[in-house]
From Swiss-Prot:
Function summary: May play a key role in the regulation of the intracellular concentration of adenosylhomocysteine.
GO cellular component, one term: cytosol
Protein encoded by which gene: ahcY
Native organism: Variovorax paradoxus (strain S110)
Binding note for cofactor: Binds 1 NAD(+) per subunit.
InterPro entries per record: Adenosylhomocyst_ase-like_sf (IPR042172), Adenosylhomocysteinase-like (IPR000043), Ado_hCys_hydrolase_NAD-bd (IPR015878), NAD(P)-bd_dom_sf (IPR036291), S-Ado-L-homoCys_hydrolase_CS (IPR020082)
Residue positions binding NAD(+): 205-207, 239, 268-273, 291, 326, 347-349, 392
Name of the protein in question: Adenosylhomocysteinase
UniProt keyword terms in alphabetical order: Cytoplasm, Hydrolase, NAD, One-carbon metabolism
Gene Ontology terms for molecular function: adenosylhomocysteinase activity
Keyword Ubl conjugation: no
Length: 479
C-alpha cells in the first residue's frame, strides 16, 4: 500500500497556506457564496466606482473561510489593500485561503496551525512596507476577538516595560509573550511604528468588544473603534440564526451522534445561546440552560427550557455547549462528574470557556482532527470537540453565507465610516454604527428572501414621529 503524501505548506513573507493546489476548488465555492451574499455584492456595486477605501491598508484578523474570502475581495473592490490571518487556529478553510493567496492577497492561515504560528502570522499581517517607510504598517484593523488589537497594545506596553510579559497565566499567553519578546529583541520599536498610522478598528465579536470597552474605560485604547457586534443586523442574525444552523452541523460532522432524546445543556442564553438552544430543541433534544443573568434566565424559562446550574447538569446531560464569552464556565469538577462519552464543546469564543488546561494531564486519544477522547482516572471518557475552541468552525464550516453577508456588510460599512470620517469618531472611544446604516444592511438582504416592505404613508409617519425612509426605531429599542 502506498503512503498518502500530504502537501507541503507554502510559507513566504506574503503567505502561509496549506496547499496552493486547492485554489481552484476554493474559487468555485467563493463564486457560489457570492450568490448567497447579497449585502456584500450590493456594496461592491454601489461603491466600486467611488473607491472609498482607496489608500486603506487593512490588517484583517478573522476566520479565513469562503465567506471571509468574499469580504476580502469586497474590501479590495472598494480600493483597500489587505493582509489577512485567521483569528482561530482551527477555523481556516484551506481551500479558501488558497484561492485568496492565488489571487495575490497576502494571507497567513492554515487549519490546525500551532499557537506559535498563529502569533507569527498575526505579526505578519502588520508588515505593509519597509522599516521606517510611510505606510510601513496598516491604517485600519478589521478584528474578530480582538487579538490583532491586543497585540498592538500589549507590544507597545512591552516596549516600555518588559515586566508586563513576566507572568503568563496560560500556555497561549506564554507563547504570545515569547513572540513579543522575540520581536522586540530584533526591533525594539516595532509595535509603536506599526501602530503609528492606525485610524481605527472594527470589531466583529462580543469577546473583542469586551476587550475594547475595557481598554476604553481605562483610557488605554489607542485608536477609534466601531463595535460591529452590536449592530442589530449582526448580533440578532449572525449570533442567533448563524449559530442555530452551524452548531449542530459541527457536532454532527464531528460525532454523528443522534441528538433526539439527549439532554443538552447550553451555558448562556444570550443571542448565541438562544440560537444554540433552538437548534438542539429542533432536533428533539431536551434542552437545559444555565445563566447568571435573571432576565436571560427568565427568558429561557418562558421559552420552555429548564434553567439549571452547571453543578446540577454535570452528571445528567449528554451534550454540553458553552456560549458565554466568559472563562471557566465548564470547570474540572464539572467534567469529572460527567457521564461516560459526554460531548463537550464551545461556540462562544476562546477555548478558556472550558477549562481544557486542567485535563491536559489525562490520556488523550485523537479520534479524528478536532475530536478527542479524554480518559479520566476512573476510566470514564468524555468527547471534547475542537479542543475547546469554536466547534462550528473547528468541526464544521461555520455560519452559512447568507447570514455572514449581513455581518460582513456591517464590517465593510464600518471600515468605510472610520476611514472616510475619522473626525466623526474620537480616538479611544467605542461606537456602534448609526441606526440608518443598520437598517440599510437589512434592506440589502430583503429581496433575496422574497420579503416585501410596507411603506408608511405621510400621515402614518407623522403620527409615530419618524421619517418615511427611517430610522424607524429609537436607539433604545430592543429588537
Amino acid at each position: 500500500m502506498s503512503a498518502v503524501l500530504k502537501p507541503t505548506p507554502v510559507s513566504t513573507a506574503d503567505q502561509a497556506i496549506a496547499d496552493l493546489s486547492l485554489a481552484a476548488w476554493g474559487r468555485k465555492e467563493i463564486k457560489i457564496a457570492e450568490t448567497e451574499m447579497p449585502g456584500l455584492m450590493a456594496i461592491r456595486e454601489e461603491f466600486s466606482k467611488a473607491q472609498p477605501l482607496k489608500g486603506a491598508r487593512i490588517t484583517g484578523s478573522l476566520h479565513m473561510t469562503i465567506q471571509t474570502a468574499v469580504l476580502i475581495e469586497t474590501l479590495q473592490a472598494l480600493g483597500a489593500t489587505v493582509r489577512w490571518a485567521s483569528c482561530n487556529i482551527f477555523s481556516t478553510q484551506d481551500h479558501a485561503a488558497a484561492a485568496i493567496a492565488a489571487a495575490g492577497t497576502p494571507v497567513f492561515a492554515i487549519k490546525g496551525e500551532s499557537l506559535k504560528d498563529y502569533w507569527d502570522y498575526t505579526h505578519a499581517i502588520f508588515d505593509f512596507g519597509p522599516k521606517g517607510s510611510q505606510g510601513e504598517g496598516p491604517n485600519m484593523i478589521l478584528d474578530d476577538g480582538g487579538d490583532a488589537t491586543l497585540l498592538m497594545h500589549l507590544g507597545q506596553r512591552a516596549e516600555k516595560d518588559l515586566g508586563v510579559l513576566s507572568k503568563p497565566t496560560s500556555e497561549e499567553e506564554r507563547i504570545l509573550y515569547a513572540a513579543i519578546k522575540a520581536k522586540l529583541a530584533v526591533d525594539p520599536t516595532w509595535y509603536t511604528r506599526k501602530s503609528a498610522e492606525i485610524i481605527g478598528v472594527t470589531e466583529e465579536t462580543t469577546t473583542g468588544v469586551h476587550r475594547l470597552n475595557e481598554m476604553s474605560a481605562k483610557g488605554t485604547l489607542l485608536f477609534r473603534a466601531i463595535n460591529v457586534n452590536d449592530s442589530v443586523t449582526k448580533s440578532k442574525f449572525d449570533n442567533l440564526y448563524g449559530c442555530r444552523e452551524s452548531l449542530v452541523d459541527g457536532i454532527k460532522r464531528a460525532t454523528d451522534v443522534m441528538i433526539a432524546g439527549k439532554v443538552a445543556c447550553v451555558a448562556g442564553y444570550g443571542d448565541v445561546g438562544k440560537g444554540s438552544a433552538q437548534a438542539l430543541r429542533a432536533l428533539s433534544a431536551q434542552v437545559w440552560v444555565t445563566e447568571i443573568d435573571p432576565i436571560n434566565a427568565l427568558q429561557a424559562a418562558m421559552e420552555g427550557y429548564k434553567v439549571v446550574t452547571m453543578e446540577y447538569a454535570a452528571d445528567k446531560a449528554d451534550i454540553f455547549v458553552t456560549t458565554t464569552g466568559n472563562r471557566d464556565v465548564i470547570r474540572h469538577e464539572h467534567m469529572a462528574a460527567m457521564k461516560d462519552q459526554a460531548i463537550v464543546c464551545n461556540i462562544g469564543h476562546f477555548d478558556n470557556e472550558i477549562d481544557v488546561a486542567s485535563i491536559e494531564k489525562y490520556e488523550w486519544e485523537e479520534i479524528k482532527p478536532q475530536v478527542d477522547h479524554i480518559t479520566f482516572p476512573d476510566g470514564k471518557k468524555i468527547i471534547l470537540l475542537a479542543k475547546g475552541r469554536l466547534v462550528n468552525l473547528g468541526c464544521g464550516t461555520g455560519h452559512p453565507s447568507f447570514v455572514m453577508s449581513s455581518s460582513f456588510a456591517n464590517q465593510t460599512i464600518a471600515q468605510i465610516e472610520l476611514f472616510t470620517k475619522p473626525d466623526a469618531y474620537q480616538a479611544g472611544k467605542v461606537y456602534v454604527l448609526p441606526k440608518h446604516l443598520d437598517e440599510k444592511v437589512a434592506r440589502l438582504h430583503l429581496k433575496k428572501v422574497g420579503a416585501m416592505l410596507t411603506e408608511l404613508t405621510d400621515e402614518q409617519a407623522a403620527y409615530i414621529g419618524v421619517s418615511k425612509n427611517g430610522p424607524y426605531k429609537p436607539d433604545t429599542y430592543r429588537y
